Amino acid sequence: MTKRAIVLLSGGLDSATVLAMANAAGFETYALSMRYGQRHSSELEAAKRVAAELGAKRHEIIDLDLRRFGGSALTDDALDVPTDGAAGGIPITYVPARNTIMLSLALGWAEAIGGRDLFFGANAVDYSGYPDCRPEYVAAYETLANLATKAGVEGDRFHVHAPIIDMTKAEIILAGVKLGVDYGLTVSCYKADDDGRACGVCDSCRIRRAGFEAAGVPDPTRYQTPN
C-alpha cells in the first residue's frame, strides 16, 4: 500500500532536505507551499524547482495573504529584516502562527488523499526563538491532528514528522548531500532578489553560509554582491 505524505516546502535548504528524507523513507510525497505575502517570489520559484527535482508526486501552492495581518519582518515592509544576529527572545522574523496555519492546510490535504503523515522543516537549533519549531509544539500538533479529524477520531492516526529538529545546519547539509539534494536550487534568504540571489547579510544567509563552511561543502548560493 502506498504511503502518502504531505511535505511543507518553502524552497529553502531545510525543507528541501526534509522532502528528500520523506522520499528516502518510502513515502509518495506531496509538496505544499504557501504564497503568504513573503517579501519575494523567488522562494516559491525555488520550491517549484525542488519539488520537480526531487520527484514530488504533486506540488500545490496555496494563496493566503498574511500581509493583511502583518506582525513580522517577513510580511510587513515597515519592519526591518535583522542583520545583526539573534538578540534573544522570539525573532522579528517569526510569522504569527505560520507553522500552525501551514500544517493545518497540510492536514486537510492529507486527510483528503488518504495520507497520514506530515513533514516539515522545524529546527530548534538555529532558530531556537521560534515557538512553533520546538519538539513540544510538534507533539502538541500531532495530538490536535488526531482530535480534530475524522480519520484521527476513528483511529487512523496522523503522524507529524520534524526530522531535522535537533540537527545543526551542517548536519542538515551533510544529510541532504547524501540524499542527492542540489542546494543550488534552494533559496533561504529573507531578502532575495527576483532572480533568487541572496543578500548575504540577513540572519538566514549568515546561518546558511556558516552551515556550508562547518560541513566542508562548497556553498552553491548565488549572492547579490560577491563575497
From Swiss-Prot:
Pathway: Purine metabolism; 7-cyano-7-deazaguanine biosynthesis. Keywords: ATP-binding, Ligase, Metal-binding, Nucleotide-binding, Queuosine biosynthesis, Zinc. ATP binds at residues 9-19. GO terms for molecular function: ATP binding; ligase activity, forming carbon-nitrogen bonds; zinc ion binding. Coiled coil: none annotated. GO terms for biological process: queuosine biosynthetic process. It is an enzyme of class 6 (ligase). It catalyses: 7-carboxy-7-deazaguanine + NH4(+) + ATP = 7-cyano-7-deazaguanine + ADP + phosphate + H2O + H(+). It holds the Pfam family QueC. Binds 1 zinc ion per subunit. Its cofactor is Zn(2+). Its EC number is 6.3.4.20. Belongs to the QueC family. Catalyzes the ATP-dependent conversion of 7-carboxy-7-deazaguanine (CDG) to 7-cyano-7-deazaguanine (preQ(0)). This is 7-cyano-7-deazaguanine synthase. It comes from Cupriavidus metallidurans (strain ATCC 43123 / DSM 2839 / NBRC 102507 / CH34) (Ralstonia metallidurans).
